[in-house]
């Protein structure tokens, strides 16, 4: 069995009424992970580690995540992690072992993990680009079709709400290379709320955040940080435990709020 935790959208460096102390809530999330009663095989942060891509913010998030009790910590960048330099500072801090602009794959416990970067060259939607599509195609060519595949990205790889940029314009091409596999799951951040959808052989799960909620799709003109009534913020924040038992096609997910 593979067991891991997804955390996302910590936005270290954010200040404002929606969450006056994003460092405290991210620290709370890390404490939750460290007190699950077991050691996860890895922890994945699905992007927007920082709010403004500053070296200090990357140092802080790296320092905090070094306290996670797990053998591996993986990350993918969000658009907030590549504000002014196409992700160079992010890759300096977290890019070890990655190729291209920060993508990579790894095998753990018989499961094939693919970490993608769809937050560079943003026009309206997330974008993978030709180099990364070629990487995915070659990466999975050697795998047998019963290999379980889990894909991590920041922006959803499905059209959750394109009007707000909640989708990836060339994701269909990437997913076409995964069509022959019996178990394909995509986990993303970016939208700061739980959402799931199944299309063909792929199940998509958007994760929550440790920073602040965003409105539901179409609720208002734009996805601006939402300020909740006093005492309600931590109910909207959380972590996600994921487990996979060999031979299954579906992952088991458990969402835990930061109460």
Where are these regions (language model features)?
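Hydrophobic beta-strand anchors of alpha/beta hydrolase catalytic cores
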Residues: 4, 43, 113, 149-150
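Surface-exposed cleft-lining segments at the edges of enzyme active sites
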Residues: 14-16, 49-50, 119-130, 158-163
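N-terminal active-site segment of His-dependent metallophosphoesterases
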Residues: 1-59, 138, 160
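Short acidic, glycine-rich surface-loop motifs adjacent to enzyme active sites
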Residues: 143-160
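Extended active-site neighborhood of metal-dependent phosphoesterases/phosphodiesterases
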Residues: 54-148, 170-185, 197-200, 208, ...
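Active-site glycine-centered loops adjacent to acidic/histidine catalytic or metal-binding residues
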Residues: 9, 47-48, 78-79, 154, ...
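Short, well-ordered beta-to-alpha junction loops that form the rim of enzyme active sites
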Residues: 118, 152-157, 189-191, 256
